Curated annotation (Swiss-Prot):
Assigned keywords, A-Z: Ion channel impairing toxin, Neurotoxin, Secreted, Toxin, Voltage-gated sodium channel impairing toxin
Gene source species: Androctonus mauritanicus mauritanicus (Scorpion)
Keyword Secreted: yes
Domain-level remarks: Has the structural arrangement of an alpha-helix connected to antiparallel beta-sheets by disulfide bonds (CS-alpha/beta).
Molecular functions (GO terms): sodium channel regulator activity; toxin activity
Family: Belongs to the long (4 C-C) scorpion toxin superfamily. Sodium channel inhibitor family. Alpha subfamily.
Functional summary from the UniProt entry: Alpha toxins bind voltage-independently at site-3 of sodium channels (Nav) and inhibit the inactivation of the activated channels, thereby blocking neuronal transmission.
Compartments, as annotated in UniProt: Secreted
Tissues expressed in: Expressed by the venom gland.
Main location: secreted
Record's keyword annotation contains Transmembrane helix: no
This protein's name: Alpha-toxin
Amino acid sequence: GRDGYIAQPENXVYXX
């Protein structure tokens, strides 16, 4: 979610 689209469930949502 650091970039707002990276496919990683870091914050429960991709970015979102």
